[in-house]
Amino acid sequence: MATTEKIRKIWLLGLALITIGLGGSNVYALGMMGPPTAELEKGMFSGGIEYTYSSMDLDLIEGQANIYRNGEFYGSGIVESITIKDFQVNTLYAAVGYGIFENYEAFVRMGVANGTFGDSLWEEREEFNNKYNFAIGAGLKATIYTGFAWKIGGLFQINRIELDGEIDSSSWNIPQPQFAEISTTEMQIAIGAKYLWTRRISVYGGPFAHFISGNFDYEFTRITNDFDTGEYSWEINEGPTYGGYLGAQIEIAKNCSANIEYQHTSNANVFGANIMMRY
């Protein structure tokens, strides 16, 4: 009877997480998830650093453009949808967690991110580069079942990143000032299991759903006989995209652990690592 009740709770958690995800309106820079179970007892804290590298294809849709010639409005129109290929993002976070209830944990992260992509807007070997910009995230973890060497649970997290930088190309003989600003909010919902493999090593993984929304704003100045300035804006809105993740947790010392992790979806690959202390 107890086993049946635990299984029912697992299915209810999965259904609740999916329902929350489908109802989210602002939901890309995939973030590290870690084990999908609560790691902290009630009242405990954790703190540490996280690093994530992600590579993905980013669809830009519903584009709009405004063109100005010699400082005066010239015209506007619809811009075709495009795909930013191999959009690479590096993030570095300071993360803090807290055991809010038994088997429930909340966490926040704050740090910096930078991103690059190339040859996707004009196919003229142009590249986007930026300095590190602000990134923030938060989430919840819950443990639903504990038995033998197994734990089963779920995770919900949201990350927001804003990137701005210049676009340039070695093929442009005349300087063409171009700037882009990318703002994305991504949401991940996962269920999964954690297995204690040895006294110090655990493995974890499972399926997850991913959602993304945001904007891609682009401004250029074309230096010809006239002085043209263009302002382009696209929307980013994808999901749910389904994928899987696999990771390992290593107990380095008492109350100190490290995680390494890989995530994969149809259009993204993610590698992550962290080191956390529990207090």
Task: Describe the function of each predicted region.
Residues M1-E41:
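Cleavable N-terminal export/targeting peptides
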Residues S25-R69:
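Outer-membrane beta-barrel biogenesis signature
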Residues G47-Y53, V108-V112, G154-R160, G205-F211, ...:
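Transmembrane beta-barrel strands of outer-membrane/channel proteins
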Residues I49, A94-Y98, A138-A142, I158, ...:
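Residues on the lipid-exposed face of transmembrane beta-strands in outer-membrane beta-barrel proteins
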Residues S55-V89, M110-A135, I158-E186, S213-T224, ...:
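Extracellular/periplasm-exposed beta-strand and loop segments of Gram-negative cell-envelope proteins
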Residues T83-R109, T116, I182, K194, ...:
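Outer-membrane beta-barrel transmembrane strands
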Residues D86, E238-P240, N259-N274:
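Solvent-exposed loop/turn segments connecting transmembrane beta-strands
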Residues N103-A106, G147-I152, R200-V203, I250-I260:
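Repeated loop/turn-to-beta-strand initiation elements of outer-membrane beta-barrel proteins
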